[in-house]
Amino acid sequence: MKLPRRAVSVCALACGLALVTSSTAVAAIAPVLITGPSPYAACSQFDNSLTGSTFPNAEVEPQAAVHGSTAIAMWHQDRRSNGGAHGIGVGYSTDGGASWTETTIALTACSANTQPALSNMFRASDPWVSIGADGIAYASALSFNLTVPNNANAVVAARSTDGGATWDHIQPVPGAFFQTADNSTDKNATTADPTKNKTAYTVWDTLTLPTDNPDDNPHTQAYTGPAYFSKTTDGGKTWSQAQIIVNTAKRTQTIGNIIVVDPRNDTLYDFTDLIVQPNTPFQGTRSNAQLAFVKSTDGGATWTQPQVIAPFNSLGVIDPNTGRPARVGDGLESVAIDPSNGKLYVVYESSTMFNKNINQSAGSWDDEILLATSSDGGATWTGPTVIHKLANDMPTFTPTVAVNGGRVAVTYYDSRNLQPGQTANWPTDYWVEYSTDGGATWGGEQHIAGPFDLSTAPVARGFFLGDYEALQPSGSGFLAVFVKTNCDAPYLSGNPLCAPASSNTTPTTNTNPTDVFSTSLP
């Protein structure tokens, strides 16, 4: 059973953060539960005909948008082990995230009212949502099927004019609908223009042959993956034909494209992970994944050539005690812009243990959060500089950045409460830090949630909470939307929620492994 969707006090808060080692951290407002029982439970009838396994009631990888007192969140609903989920879940709030109502968006055959073009799609992934100044909400996601017919996949756009309660004009973006795996769409993001009414932008990459399936797989050994762009200027009723904005050669691709807009001059910035041929030297290291960006000053008609900011130098995350992997936001950036002065903020996870072979090895994982900033439209960059790293070098991962009133916030997970030799569970916490001087210094670390057991999360190439989490300006502060497992410390062995996540192939007592929560941060 799911819990009521109002403030939920997790054990770490009730126990006074006894397991937290940081002496400067303070407790945050109790998280609010967003997600309830899966609205796609009936879709399990199709699971036996599909590859992989399904984790019912597993919600992961949320995105969110805020406009005044309206907040909208989206997430993967019923995550699958080898890509996507039964569908996309939606929550909307009319009180700034104090309470939530759930609804759905018809992107797969798991919804009763799915349009014919998507009726053969049984999976959805990568939700993104953004709200314009006029209150129109724009969403995008991947809709796909690994088996029928021949790995069909698409970037699908939708809009809402009632704060996320209902969605219409659900449609594949022109030039982003494919019937075979020769072309596979991935990692879409949608951004509403902050000053132009009825205008929004969607970006994604399309992986071109040879590839294996439209799973969200970032490996790039033998195909190409340009960045594509589409826009709407009629409030999401129609979208422009996809155009390439970052062209790529063989064995080169983009992934994690995200647009931010400077409201002072309507300059568009698209940030991406530009992955070049393996073992390409960069500034004294050997990294094939590079943080880069392009920009447009004419509404997306033309774009600059990619400018590389820094190598990602990311190894991913493993449990230091067991070697079991977690799937995290490695090789993906989070981006924000200060609307008052156009300053750009980019955060990502990295590893001080990065080696010249690139490959992760025993005893190596991402252990720091880095920040790069630009105050001149990307002409020059400060950093990357380390803004969070644990003294014991434990994993830290999946950062998210937002700016509000000149104040910068970054959220992240870390494993500071994992003890040497602790193998039965993987204590994980969610945190936020702040900067009031443009990212030069950081402090005021605040505890959001945990410790919870990461090893009870659904498995998708590792224990999975999401490639992204969400953080948005809200009022004078921020709204964080994130995922945690429901196995909180002290991990009682008799607690059904502390068993491994139940799937349709490996049933256990844990039929509700994860949920989506929100927290209002001051």
Model-derived features: where do they sit?
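C-terminal PAP-associated
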Residues: 27-522
